[in-house]
Amino acid sequence: MATVAELKAVLKDTLEKKGVLGHLKARIRAEVFNALDDDREPRPSLSHENLLINELIREYLEFNKYKYTASVLIAESGQPVVPLDRQFLIHELNAFEESKDNTIPLLYGILAHFLRGTKDGIQNAFLKGPSLQPSDPSLGRQPSRRKPMDDHLRKEEQKSTNIEDLHVSQAVNR
């Protein structure tokens, strides 16, 4: 017969494999934060830049279903509960959407823009080449149950290995 310690270990392993344990931990962290958060204490007002940055992050978090992380961001930063209009964000960032697919977060388009470089062909030195890839491919891999790349990007990567050929629905207009 199994001991209590063995049963705990099997239960923990099973919950980790199913991704439930991480979900539960995130939910508990979010609930603890909400319980400790003092609503009576006024939040400092957000600068325009922080409002935009937080909204880009929220859009990314919600797209990737990090809903508890997004709820903590909103509560902690003082970001409005109602998301900013996407067209407002695009206008404020001087960005444009390359396609009608507006389901992909603007951050993906911004990242793709800097990975491709600027219009005149000058590449961003901070994001170019080997600095993005560790010399040992096993380095930098997360021991997560999540796929290393989002499903929507993985499908596109199979079609093309060149980042410029990936379908990205937004790019920054400079």
Curated annotation (Swiss-Prot):
Changing residue 53 to Q: Loss of interaction with KIAA0753. Keywords: Cell projection, Cilium biogenesis/degradation, Cytoplasm, Cytoskeleton, Phosphoprotein. Disulfide bonds: none annotated. It holds the Pfam family FOP_dimer. The keyword ATP-binding does not apply. It is found in: Cytoplasm, Cytoskeleton, Microtubule organizing center, Centrosome, Centriole; Cell projection, Cilium; Cytoplasm, Cytoskeleton, Cilium basal body; Cytoplasm, Cytoskeleton, Microtubule organizing center, Centrosome. Widely expressed. Detected in brain, heart, kidney, liver, lung, skeletal muscle, placenta and intestine. PANTHER family: CENTROSOMAL PROTEIN 20 (PTHR15431:SF21), FGFR1 ONCOGENE PARTNER/LISH DOMAIN-CONTAINING PROTEIN (PTHR15431). Involved in the biogenesis of cilia. Required for the recruitment of PLK1 to centrosomes and S phase progression. Homooligomer; probably required for localization to centrosomes. Forms a complex with KIAA0753/OFIP and OFD1; within this complex may stabilize the interaction between OFD1 and KIAA0753/OFIP. Interacts with PCM1; this interaction may be mediated by KIAA0753/OFIP. Interacts with PLK1 in later G1, S, G2 and M phases of the cell cycle; this interaction recruits PLK1 to centrosomes. Belongs to the CEP43 family. This is Centrosomal protein 20. It comes from Homo sapiens.
